[in-house]
Amino acid sequence: MTAAPTAPPTSEDIAAIRARMPRAFGMTKPRRARAIAGWLAGGAWLVTLLWWFDITPMRIWNGLSGLLTIVRLMFPPSPGAQWADILQGMAESVAMAFLGTFAALVIAIPLGFLGARNVVVNALAHFSLRRAFDGLRGIDQLIWALTFVRAVGLGPLAGVLAICAAEIAVLAKLFAEAIENADARQGEAIAAVGGSGLLRIRYGLLPQVLPVMLSQFLYQFESNTRSASILGVVGAGGIGLQIAERIKVRYWDQVLFIILLIFATVAVIDALSSRVRGKLIGAG
């Protein structure tokens, strides 16, 4: 028994199949033209940027040659005669990172609750606060450091304030998202027995999100330890000042020693904070 012949597809059938699987039919002429125009525009923009910044193969080659000379002068690494100042600067950077991140944590916790949609239900207030977080997150720590150096003078206080100002919005946004993702049933149970809004936050939301908050604090502290090493370049204290001074006088062996010290310090903090974060998340 032979199968009945299948009717050829109509133009409507072909159009429907093309709409569902456009890649199976290849690119249409208008789409191909748009793709070519996009590639040409991207290439023209790239060439324009290379011309604007005067990026040439000769400049790159000369720069790499100079970099190789500096790398050769870095070995062997040496702390020099002022190794105590280097260690003090490293300890100062770690302390700046901790104090700045901790101050940001204290301020960001209430802001995180205010920015959470399940705590503040007013759409305008929620939108305004979230956009404020986004705006503050766009300001780099170095800009804050330059501002606070001018306001309070040289030294670690400017670095602490810069880290704090830069981290408040970052932590507040992370906290708000964690609060919004918390299980609402605990808060609903507290509200069902007559608990106030503050009690719902204290006993329904905070126990769930506190481990996440502390984990984020540790992660940002680790990240800010690296950032604090750079803030000293603009006068905000820490090991960055030691790096800047030695680069000026071209003590490249001491520069490498400081870089290795920063690497070791960050590695130790990373290992410790990773273990603590794992326990916090497991406990949460």
Describe the role of every protein-language-model region.
Residues 1-102, 109, 114, 118, ...:
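N-terminal, non-cleaved signal-anchor transmembrane helix
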